[in-house]
Amino acid sequence: PVFATVMSLLLVVLGVIVPKWLQLRRAEFIRTYRWPRGLLDRLEKHHPAFQRKDSALVSRGLRQFFLAYLMSGKRYVSMPSQVADDLWHEFILYTREYDAFCRRAFGGFLHHAPAVVLSEHRKSNEGLRRVWWYCCKYENIDPVSPTRLPLLFALDSKFNVANGFVYHPDCEALRKNGSGAAHCGGDFADSS
């Protein structure tokens, strides 16, 4: 009986506590990671109106995306921001640094998936819904009835990014006015 109890306890530690500890450690790594020298400069070349504070805000949005991927159990996520996707693309070009980042942050390589909006394609919707959920939770926003957008979903609109994705937390008023082009945060909570 003592052996069985010890083995059960060991299984709990190895199966529950260690993975949670590792996830928390990886999340802290993502939050505090120092970007490679010159990365934000490269983003600013693509977006000449950006000041360093703007690039830093975009980098916070990219961190939010990486955290959503990690906290979802490394399940498929879609990038909801064009400007954060631009920074992700630049980061990938620092191949050694990106590979090392992925190994420490996720335990393996995170392949790039293009920025997308809510669509007819179920897999893309699942990825957007997942990143919406975790970004909302990260910022203490109710994902079903949001009163504001999480940073990652607000970036393109904030910076008026060409071909960017514009989201609204709640589109009831927009729909009443006949605007069907808006992407609505509350729609991400819909399971359909």
State each model region's role.
Residues 1-192:
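Acidic, Ser/Thr/Pro-rich intrinsically disordered cytosolic tails and loops
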